[in-house]
Structure formats: C-alpha cells, structure tokens
C-alpha cells in the first residue's frame, strides 16, 4: 500500500512539474510579446509607465530614474506594457496619443511580430538539434476492411518517415490531410518516405474515401492510410499511430524549413479559425489559457524536449496570429 501511495504521489508531482514548465513556457511567450511593445516604444521615444510580468498584486517592483516601473506580479499568466496617454488624453508629447499614427501602429503590431520571430528562433533551434520536422508512422493498424491487396510498395509500414506527399513537404499532420483529402477508395497518392534508412518514392493506396471534414478528423486520416487509432469508451480518439520526428538536413535547408514550418503553423491556425466561422468545429476547439497549459503539460510529458520546443513554437505563432486579428 505504501509503495502504491508513493508511486501515485510521484506521478502527481511529475505532472505538477510538467504543468509548471507549461506555465513557464506561456509566461515566456507573453513576456516576449510585451517586450516587442516595449522595445519599439523605446525606439520611438514613447513614455512608458510600466512593464509587468504576470498580473495581480506586485511581488517585486523597481522604478527607474526616468519613471518607468518594472514589476513582477503574483499570477504568472499574463503581463503588460503600459504607455502614458494610452487610455486618456495627455499633454506630454511622448504620450501614446500624441505620437504619429504609423509609430503607434508599429508599436501595436510589434508584440505579435516579436512572438513570430521568437517562434522561428525556437524552430531553428529545434530543427538544428533534432532535425527538421517530419511525420513517422509509428504504428500501422494491421487491419484492412477494404479488401485491397496491400504490399510493401503501396502501404505504410511501422516507422516509415514521411518526407513528402504529392511532391509537397510534410511537416505536420494537416499536410497529410491536404494531400489525401478528396481521394476515393483505391486511389493512390505519391509519397516520399524513409524506410529502414533508405529514401524511396511510393504510391500509397487509399483504404477508404478521404472525406476529411476538418483539422480534427485525425481518425478519418488514419482510416484512409491504415494507421492505428486508439479510442475511449465514447469513441473519441485518444491517440494515433503518427509521431513527430526529425530529419537531418544542411544548414541553409534547415533555416528555410524553419520559416516554412512557421508558415505551416500559421496556416493551420487560420484554417481552424475558418472552420470555426463555418461551424465545422466548435468554439471549444480553441480552448483558453488553462486548456493551453493542460495540453502543453501533456505534450511535454509524452514527448520530451522536442515536443516542448515544438509546442512553444506553436504557442508563439498562435499568439502572433490572434493578436493581429481584429478581435477585442
């Protein structure tokens, strides 16, 4: 009994650690965002009142000679950079409301730009350490209700690394969805994969009609490609046989892939927003701060440092996109 209690306590403490790391990731991204506002404000000589990390009561405060306040607050899930004249009229020529419109616009968008550039930096770091992002068929289903005869040349095997689909690079699972969506049972799609260390081109046969309704339809994608899916008692997908992996490339190719990957992440976010407005997915799919923390903690728990850097880059791009949208 004591052993079981100790094991349970260890699991709880491990999860708490993952949650704390997730909170730290989110805090860093928010701080980077506010730092973008702060730095451009300094460049254009805006009167800055306070730069705060977190929100709520102050636990640390330092006032500079020019009157700027730097503070750390008790709740590490936010932050802000406040400018004089931001909310009310002020006679100071350095006040926000007295600056030129183009300067104010640059200051306003600089937070999102900083998030995006920082996300690209993280992606470059991740790709430099682990290789550029690709998808691996970690586990195929082994089931074939279609009746199509499968061979080594027209179907995936365990641990195939997918590089391209229809001639386009595959970084994330939505790339696969775009490549196969609309295909019918028995159609083929051209793939470039690494199998047993050897790069090869293959024509993979579709094992079902690929009528993928939205970015959440991973179950449909797995059925089409013969990849294993695990579901809970309510028929919700809890895991699938795809895993992210890294592929070593040259320096400049890695840099180019980093930018391309950031565009893919941004495109996925815009796709989700579009599907949300068309009613194809629910508002719950977006989640919130606590959902972000929970998902991040789960990803870190199962995927290690690669997944930590990957989810951090996604959060950075996500913050960049949503802060540029005309949403109050």
Show which residues each predicted segment covers.
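Functional transmembrane alpha-helices
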Residues: 2-13, 99, 141-148, 209-321
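Small-residue-rich helix-interface/hinge motifs
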Residues: 14-91, 317, 322-325
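Internal alpha-helical transmembrane segments
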Residues: 32, 43, 50, 70, ...
């Amino acid at each position: 009994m004591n052993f079981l209690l100790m094991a349970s306590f260890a699991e709880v403490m491990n999860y708490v650690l993952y949650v704390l790391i997730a909170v730290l990731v989110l805090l860093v991204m928010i701080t980077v965002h506010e730092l973008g506002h702060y730095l451009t404000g300094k460049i254009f000589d805006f009167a800055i009142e306070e730069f705060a990390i977190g929100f709520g009561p102050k636990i640390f405060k330092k006032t500079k000679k020019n009157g700027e306040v730097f503070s750390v607050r008790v709740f590490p899930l936010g932050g802000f950079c406040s400018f004089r004249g931001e909310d009310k009229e002020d006679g100071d020529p350095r006040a926000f409301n007295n600056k030129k419109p183009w300067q104010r616009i640059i200051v306003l968008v600089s937070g999102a730009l900083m998030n995006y550039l920082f996300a690209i930096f993280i992606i470059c770091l991740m790709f430099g350490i682990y290789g550029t992002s690709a998808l691996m068929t970690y586990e195929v289903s082994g089931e074939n209700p279609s009746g199509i005869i499968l061979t080594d040349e027209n179907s995936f095997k365990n641990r195939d690394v997918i590089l391209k689909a229809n001639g386009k690079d595959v970084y994330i699972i939505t790339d696969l969805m775009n490549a196969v969506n609309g295909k019918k049972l028995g159609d083929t799609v051209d793939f470039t994969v690494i199998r047993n260390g050897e790069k090869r081109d293959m024509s993979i046969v579709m094992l079902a009609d690929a009528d993928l309704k939205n970015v959440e339809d991973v179950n449909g994608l797995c059925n089409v490609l013969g990849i294993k899916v695990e579901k809970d008692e309510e028929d919700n997908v809890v895991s699938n046989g795809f895993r992210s992996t890294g592929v070593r490339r040259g320096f400049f190719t890695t840099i180019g892939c980093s930018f391309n990957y950031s565009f893919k992440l941004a495109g996925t976010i815009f796709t989700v927003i579009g599907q949300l407005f068309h009613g194809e997915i629910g508002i719950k799919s977006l989640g919130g701060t606590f959902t972000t923390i929970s998902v991040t903690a789960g990803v870190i728990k199962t995927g290690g440092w690669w997944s930590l850097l990957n989810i951090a880059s996604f959060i950075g791009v996500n913050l960049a996109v949503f802060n540029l949208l005309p949403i109050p």
